[in-house]
Amino acid sequence: MNFEEHCEVLLTSSGNERQVDADILAKCLLAARSKNRLAQTMGKITVDSPIPYLLSDLNNILQEEMGKLDKATSSAPYIRIKSKLDELKADPRYQFMFSGMLVGDTMADFIRKIFRLPSNGKPISIIDVSGVPSDITSTVVAVLSRLVFDFAIWGREEKTRPILLVCEEAHRYVPNEKNADGSSVAKILSRIAKEGRKYGISLGLITQRPSDLAEGVLSQCGTIIAMRLNNDRDQAFVKAAMPEGARGFLDSIPALRNRECIICGEGVAIPMRVTFDTLEEHRRPASEDPSFVELWSQEGGEEELVERVVMRWRSQG
Protein backbone atom coordinates (compact mmCIF):
# COMPACT_ATOMS: atom_id res chain seq x y z
CA MET A 1 0.00 0.00 0.00
CA ASN A 2 1.12 3.56 -0.61
CA PHE A 3 0.83 6.31 1.99
CA GLU A 4 -2.66 7.48 0.98
CA GLU A 5 -4.00 3.93 1.27
CA HIS A 6 -2.36 3.54 4.68
CA CYS A 7 -4.16 6.71 5.80
CA GLU A 8 -7.53 5.34 4.67
CA VAL A 9 -7.02 2.18 6.72
CA LEU A 10 -5.22 3.44 9.82
CA LEU A 11 -6.49 6.97 10.43
CA THR A 12 -9.83 7.48 12.15
CA SER A 13 -9.72 11.22 12.83
CA SER A 14 -10.93 14.10 10.65
CA GLY A 15 -10.20 17.77 10.04
CA ASN A 16 -7.02 19.22 11.52
CA GLU A 17 -6.49 16.16 13.70
CA ARG A 18 -6.31 13.95 10.60
CA GLN A 19 -3.51 16.06 9.13
CA VAL A 20 -1.55 15.79 12.38
CA ASP A 21 -2.08 12.01 12.43
CA ALA A 22 -1.05 11.77 8.76
CA ASP A 23 2.22 13.62 9.39
CA ILE A 24 3.06 11.28 12.26
CA LEU A 25 2.16 8.18 10.24
CA ALA A 26 4.27 9.36 7.28
CA LYS A 27 7.34 9.81 9.48
CA CYS A 28 6.94 6.46 11.25
CA LEU A 29 6.05 4.54 8.08
CA LEU A 30 9.12 5.83 6.26
CA ALA A 31 11.29 4.82 9.21
CA ALA A 32 9.74 1.32 9.22
CA ARG A 33 10.32 0.89 5.48
CA SER A 34 13.91 2.09 5.88
CA LYS A 35 14.68 -0.82 8.21
CA ASN A 36 14.25 -3.31 5.37
CA ARG A 37 17.45 -4.51 3.67
CA LEU A 38 15.94 -3.62 0.29
CA ALA A 39 15.71 0.01 1.34
CA GLN A 40 19.32 -0.02 2.48
CA THR A 41 20.52 -1.31 -0.91
CA MET A 42 18.35 1.11 -2.91
CA GLY A 43 19.46 4.27 -1.19
CA LYS A 44 16.86 7.01 -1.05
CA ILE A 45 13.24 5.86 -0.67
CA THR A 46 9.95 7.63 -0.05
CA VAL A 47 6.92 6.84 2.08
CA ASP A 48 5.22 5.52 -1.10
CA SER A 49 8.07 3.18 -2.13
CA PRO A 50 6.81 -0.43 -2.42
CA ILE A 51 9.20 -1.70 0.26
CA PRO A 52 7.84 -4.29 2.73
CA TYR A 53 8.10 -3.56 6.43
CA LEU A 54 7.29 -5.26 9.72
CA LEU A 55 4.18 -4.16 11.57
CA SER A 56 6.14 -4.68 14.77
CA ASP A 57 8.70 -2.13 13.50
CA LEU A 58 5.94 0.41 12.82
CA ASN A 59 4.45 -0.24 16.26
CA ASN A 60 7.83 0.10 17.99
CA ILE A 61 8.66 3.32 16.12
CA LEU A 62 5.32 4.81 17.13
CA GLN A 63 6.07 3.84 20.74
CA GLU A 64 9.57 5.36 20.56
CA GLU A 65 8.30 8.62 19.06
CA MET A 66 5.62 8.83 21.73
CA GLY A 67 8.30 8.37 24.39
CA LYS A 68 10.22 11.40 23.08
CA LEU A 69 7.30 13.76 23.65
CA ASP A 70 7.43 16.50 26.24
CA LYS A 71 4.76 16.41 28.89
CA ALA A 72 2.98 19.36 27.34
CA THR A 73 2.74 17.64 23.98
CA SER A 74 -0.33 15.56 23.34
CA SER A 75 0.20 11.87 22.75
CA ALA A 76 -3.38 11.42 21.48
CA PRO A 77 -2.42 11.12 17.76
CA TYR A 78 0.04 8.31 18.51
CA ILE A 79 -2.49 6.52 20.69
CA ARG A 80 -5.13 6.75 17.96
CA ILE A 81 -2.83 5.21 15.34
CA LYS A 82 -1.54 2.49 17.69
CA SER A 83 -5.06 1.59 18.82
CA LYS A 84 -6.26 1.22 15.24
CA LEU A 85 -3.19 -0.83 14.32
CA ASP A 86 -3.71 -3.16 17.29
CA GLU A 87 -7.40 -3.47 16.42
CA LEU A 88 -6.62 -4.52 12.83
CA LYS A 89 -3.96 -7.01 13.91
CA ALA A 90 -6.37 -8.65 16.37
CA ASP A 91 -9.30 -8.89 13.93
CA PRO A 92 -9.19 -12.18 11.93
CA ARG A 93 -10.99 -10.52 9.00
CA TYR A 94 -7.88 -8.46 8.31
CA GLN A 95 -5.36 -11.29 8.52
CA PHE A 96 -4.85 -11.32 4.74
CA MET A 97 -3.42 -7.78 5.03
CA PHE A 98 -1.99 -7.54 8.52
CA SER A 99 -0.87 -11.06 9.39
CA GLY A 100 2.46 -11.28 11.17
CA MET A 101 3.44 -13.97 8.66
CA LEU A 102 3.44 -11.50 5.75
CA VAL A 103 6.94 -10.18 6.28
CA GLY A 104 8.82 -11.29 3.16
CA ASP A 105 9.34 -9.61 -0.20
CA THR A 106 6.68 -11.40 -2.26
CA MET A 107 5.88 -8.53 -4.64
CA ALA A 108 7.26 -10.18 -7.80
CA ASP A 109 5.53 -13.49 -7.05
CA PHE A 110 2.27 -11.70 -6.29
CA ILE A 111 2.38 -9.74 -9.56
CA ARG A 112 3.17 -12.87 -11.57
CA LYS A 113 0.20 -14.64 -9.99
CA ILE A 114 -2.30 -11.79 -10.30
CA PHE A 115 -1.29 -10.80 -13.85
CA ARG A 116 -0.91 -14.43 -15.01
CA LEU A 117 2.69 -14.09 -16.14
CA PRO A 118 3.07 -16.64 -17.65
CA SER A 119 -0.59 -17.32 -18.38
CA ASN A 120 -0.27 -21.08 -19.04
CA GLY A 121 -3.49 -20.99 -21.03
CA LYS A 122 -5.41 -19.22 -18.23
CA PRO A 123 -5.01 -15.48 -18.86
CA ILE A 124 -7.90 -14.29 -16.66
CA SER A 125 -7.67 -13.51 -12.93
CA ILE A 126 -10.89 -13.15 -10.94
CA ILE A 127 -10.48 -11.44 -7.58
CA ASP A 128 -13.49 -11.80 -5.28
CA VAL A 129 -13.61 -9.03 -2.68
CA SER A 130 -17.06 -9.93 -1.34
CA GLY A 131 -15.48 -11.43 1.79
CA VAL A 132 -13.31 -8.37 2.48
CA PRO A 133 -14.52 -6.13 5.35
CA SER A 134 -16.65 -3.36 3.85
CA ASP A 135 -14.64 -0.55 5.43
CA ILE A 136 -11.50 -1.49 3.48
CA THR A 137 -13.00 -2.94 0.29
CA SER A 138 -12.36 0.31 -1.59
CA THR A 139 -8.76 0.37 -0.36
CA VAL A 140 -8.16 -3.20 -1.52
CA VAL A 141 -9.57 -2.36 -4.97
CA ALA A 142 -7.41 0.78 -5.03
CA VAL A 143 -4.25 -1.22 -4.25
CA LEU A 144 -4.97 -3.78 -6.98
CA SER A 145 -5.84 -1.07 -9.53
CA ARG A 146 -2.74 0.94 -8.69
CA LEU A 147 -0.58 -2.19 -9.05
CA VAL A 148 -1.90 -2.61 -12.59
CA PHE A 149 -1.21 1.04 -13.44
CA ASP A 150 2.21 1.27 -11.80
CA PHE A 151 3.33 -2.02 -13.36
CA ALA A 152 2.39 -0.68 -16.79
CA ILE A 153 4.21 2.61 -16.20
CA TRP A 154 7.44 1.05 -14.94
CA GLY A 155 7.25 -1.66 -17.61
CA ARG A 156 7.15 0.69 -20.58
CA GLU A 157 10.60 -0.40 -21.72
CA GLU A 158 9.51 -4.04 -21.64
CA LYS A 159 7.09 -5.80 -23.98
CA THR A 160 4.38 -6.18 -21.36
CA ARG A 161 0.97 -7.52 -22.34
CA PRO A 162 -2.00 -5.16 -22.50
CA ILE A 163 -4.33 -5.54 -19.52
CA LEU A 164 -8.11 -5.18 -19.34
CA LEU A 165 -9.13 -4.30 -15.78
CA VAL A 166 -12.83 -5.06 -15.26
CA CYS A 167 -14.52 -3.61 -12.18
CA GLU A 168 -17.97 -4.82 -11.09
CA GLU A 169 -20.31 -2.58 -9.10
CA ALA A 170 -18.27 0.31 -10.49
CA HIS A 171 -20.59 2.97 -9.03
CA ARG A 172 -19.20 2.05 -5.59
CA TYR A 173 -15.67 3.00 -6.59
CA VAL A 174 -16.05 5.88 -9.08
CA PRO A 175 -19.26 7.61 -7.94
CA ASN A 176 -20.62 10.84 -9.38
CA GLU A 177 -19.75 14.19 -7.83
CA LYS A 178 -22.74 14.12 -5.48
CA ASN A 179 -21.55 10.90 -3.84
CA ALA A 180 -17.79 11.36 -4.29
CA ASP A 181 -15.63 11.12 -1.18
CA GLY A 182 -12.18 11.73 -2.67
CA SER A 183 -11.10 8.14 -2.04
CA SER A 184 -7.92 6.69 -3.49
CA VAL A 185 -9.84 4.10 -5.53
CA ALA A 186 -11.82 6.80 -7.35
CA LYS A 187 -8.60 8.67 -8.14
CA ILE A 188 -6.72 5.68 -9.53
CA LEU A 189 -9.65 4.33 -11.59
CA SER A 190 -10.28 7.81 -13.00
CA ARG A 191 -6.62 8.08 -13.92
CA ILE A 192 -6.66 4.66 -15.61
CA ALA A 193 -9.76 5.70 -17.59
CA LYS A 194 -8.05 8.89 -18.77
CA GLU A 195 -4.43 7.78 -19.23
CA GLY A 196 -4.45 3.99 -19.31
CA ARG A 197 -4.44 3.59 -23.09
CA LYS A 198 -0.98 5.12 -23.33
CA TYR A 199 0.36 2.30 -21.18
CA GLY A 200 -1.67 -0.59 -22.57
CA ILE A 201 -4.38 -0.65 -19.89
CA SER A 202 -8.10 -0.71 -20.66
CA LEU A 203 -10.81 -0.26 -18.05
CA GLY A 204 -14.15 -2.08 -18.12
CA LEU A 205 -16.83 -0.70 -15.78
CA ILE A 206 -19.87 -2.84 -14.94
CA THR A 207 -22.80 -1.22 -13.15
CA GLN A 208 -26.57 -1.49 -12.82
CA ARG A 209 -26.78 2.22 -12.00
CA PRO A 210 -24.94 4.17 -14.71
CA SER A 211 -26.37 7.48 -13.49
CA ASP A 212 -24.37 7.05 -10.27
CA LEU A 213 -21.06 6.82 -12.17
CA ALA A 214 -18.69 9.77 -12.48
CA GLU A 215 -19.46 11.50 -15.79
CA GLY A 216 -15.80 12.12 -16.54
CA VAL A 217 -15.04 8.40 -16.34
CA LEU A 218 -18.05 7.32 -18.40
CA SER A 219 -17.13 9.81 -21.12
CA GLN A 220 -13.80 7.99 -21.54
CA CYS A 221 -15.51 4.67 -22.34
CA GLY A 222 -14.97 3.98 -26.04
CA THR A 223 -17.42 1.07 -26.21
CA ILE A 224 -20.75 0.86 -24.40
CA ILE A 225 -22.67 -2.39 -23.84
CA ALA A 226 -26.13 -1.50 -22.53
CA MET A 227 -28.48 -4.17 -21.20
CA ARG A 228 -32.08 -3.64 -20.07
CA LEU A 229 -32.64 -0.37 -18.19
CA ASN A 230 -36.04 0.73 -16.88
CA ASN A 231 -35.04 3.87 -14.99
CA ASP A 232 -35.48 7.06 -17.05
CA ARG A 233 -32.51 8.71 -15.34
CA ASP A 234 -30.20 5.82 -16.20
CA GLN A 235 -31.46 5.75 -19.79
CA ALA A 236 -30.80 9.48 -20.20
CA PHE A 237 -27.31 9.08 -18.77
CA VAL A 238 -26.46 6.24 -21.17
CA LYS A 239 -27.94 8.17 -24.08
CA ALA A 240 -25.68 11.14 -23.34
CA ALA A 241 -22.64 8.85 -23.40
CA MET A 242 -23.61 7.09 -26.65
CA PRO A 243 -22.37 8.20 -30.08
CA GLU A 244 -24.88 10.24 -32.06
CA GLY A 245 -25.67 7.42 -34.48
CA ALA A 246 -26.54 4.96 -31.71
CA ARG A 247 -29.09 7.02 -29.81
CA GLY A 248 -31.97 5.68 -31.87
CA PHE A 249 -31.42 2.31 -30.20
CA LEU A 250 -32.16 3.78 -26.79
CA ASP A 251 -35.92 3.36 -27.21
CA SER A 252 -35.44 -0.42 -27.27
CA ILE A 253 -33.38 -0.61 -24.06
CA PRO A 254 -36.39 -1.02 -21.68
CA ALA A 255 -37.69 -3.86 -23.89
CA LEU A 256 -34.48 -5.90 -24.07
CA ARG A 257 -34.81 -9.52 -22.98
CA ASN A 258 -32.40 -11.51 -20.83
CA ARG A 259 -28.97 -11.83 -22.48
CA GLU A 260 -29.78 -9.06 -24.99
CA CYS A 261 -27.87 -5.79 -25.22
CA ILE A 262 -27.08 -2.78 -27.39
CA ILE A 263 -23.41 -2.40 -28.35
CA CYS A 264 -21.98 0.80 -29.80
CA GLY A 265 -18.64 2.57 -30.02
CA GLU A 266 -15.13 1.58 -31.03
CA GLY A 267 -15.67 -2.14 -30.45
CA VAL A 268 -18.17 -2.54 -33.30
CA ALA A 269 -18.37 -1.19 -36.84
CA ILE A 270 -21.98 -0.03 -36.40
CA PRO A 271 -24.35 0.06 -33.40
CA MET A 272 -26.14 -3.27 -33.07
CA ARG A 273 -28.54 -5.28 -30.95
CA VAL A 274 -26.91 -8.52 -29.80
CA THR A 275 -27.98 -11.69 -28.01
CA PHE A 276 -25.32 -13.42 -25.91
CA ASP A 277 -24.85 -17.17 -26.26
CA THR A 278 -26.24 -19.38 -23.50
CA LEU A 279 -23.55 -20.78 -21.22
CA GLU A 280 -23.57 -24.34 -20.01
CA GLU A 281 -24.88 -24.49 -16.45
CA HIS A 282 -21.53 -25.50 -14.94
CA ARG A 283 -19.87 -22.41 -16.49
CA ARG A 284 -22.37 -19.87 -15.19
CA PRO A 285 -21.62 -17.68 -12.16
CA ALA A 286 -23.83 -18.10 -9.09
CA SER A 287 -25.87 -15.01 -9.96
CA GLU A 288 -29.06 -16.43 -11.47
CA ASP A 289 -32.31 -15.13 -10.00
CA PRO A 290 -34.02 -17.72 -7.75
CA SER A 291 -37.43 -19.05 -8.78
CA PHE A 292 -39.70 -17.64 -6.07
CA VAL A 293 -42.72 -19.80 -6.96
CA GLU A 294 -40.69 -23.01 -7.09
CA LEU A 295 -38.80 -22.38 -3.85
CA TRP A 296 -41.86 -21.17 -1.93
CA SER A 297 -43.68 -24.38 -2.83
CA GLN A 298 -40.91 -26.64 -1.49
CA GLU A 299 -40.84 -27.85 2.12
CA GLY A 300 -38.47 -29.86 4.29
CA GLY A 301 -34.84 -29.56 5.34
CA GLU A 302 -35.16 -26.00 6.67
CA GLU A 303 -33.69 -26.79 10.11
CA GLU A 304 -30.51 -28.31 8.65
CA LEU A 305 -30.31 -25.47 6.13
CA VAL A 306 -30.35 -22.86 8.90
CA GLU A 307 -27.65 -24.74 10.85
CA ARG A 308 -25.36 -24.88 7.80
CA VAL A 309 -25.87 -21.20 6.98
CA VAL A 310 -25.21 -20.10 10.57
CA MET A 311 -22.02 -22.20 10.68
CA ARG A 312 -20.69 -20.61 7.46
CA TRP A 313 -21.79 -17.19 8.71
CA ARG A 314 -19.86 -17.56 11.96
CA SER A 315 -16.75 -19.00 10.34
CA GLN A 316 -16.88 -16.37 7.57
CA GLY A 317 -16.12 -19.02 4.98
What are these regions (language model features)?
Residues 258-317:
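Conserved P-loop NTPase motor module
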Residues 32-36, 170, 222, 247, ...:
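Alpha-helix boundary/capping detector
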Residues 1-5, 102, 136, 140, ...:
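Solvent-exposed, flexible loop/coil residues
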Residues 12, 184-185, 190-277:
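Conserved ATP-driven motor cores of ASCE-family P-loop NTPases powering translocation/secretion/packaging/pilus
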Residues 50-53, 133-136, 173-174, 211-214, ...:
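Flexible loop/turn segments at secondary-structure boundaries
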Residues 51, 81, 104-107, 125, ...:
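Preference for short coil/turn "hinge" residues that link or interrupt alpha-helices
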Residues 1-191:
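P-loop NTPase motor domains
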